[in-house]
Amino acid sequence: QLLEPDADAEYAAVIQIDLNEIKEPLLACPNDPDDIKPLSELQGNKIDEVFIGSCMTNIGHYRAASKVLENMRNLPVKLWIAPPTKMDKFQLTEEGVYSTFGRVGARTETPGCSLCMGNQARVADGATVVSTSTRNFPNRLGNNADVYLSSAELAAVVASIGRLPTVAEYLEAVAGIKPMAAEIYRYLNFHEMDEYRRAAS
């Protein structure tokens, strides 16, 4: 059951965002999660490494990334993959998503925080990175790394071309996701997951 507010709940502030006004992806720029710019102002910037992982992602983001990368072979960047839970990894492996990541040469990490905390590995010193994590503070993912924060879908497009795409390139690359969105973004239902609990134990 989802949480719901009391009918008489009071809020410190109410922020309304009209999503119809957002016509392109937004990124947090190095190295400040509050420094937000549209993709069109950043297009063309070269990227060395891409991290799709951390608690900010869910299973659908990996299916979407796999869809973007399905016809690729060798990527021009180092791609890191780290789903948030073992159950996600198990299901993605069953669906063949991990096969796509393996074919393109992605480095698959132990599910969990991974690069976001720099507690399993780190990006190269001075690398320019696109990450799906929540923070891009200086030196968090790697020494002197410049880290953009983006969606998993944009991160996958970046991994395929080695730079921040134009808006047109992005829209073309993700066009195959929308017709399959209901299946791609289907959640795992944890209350129905005895087999996954066993697999993750």
Go through the PLM ranges and name each one.
Residues 1-201:
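Fe-S-dependent hydro-lyases/dehydratases of central metabolism
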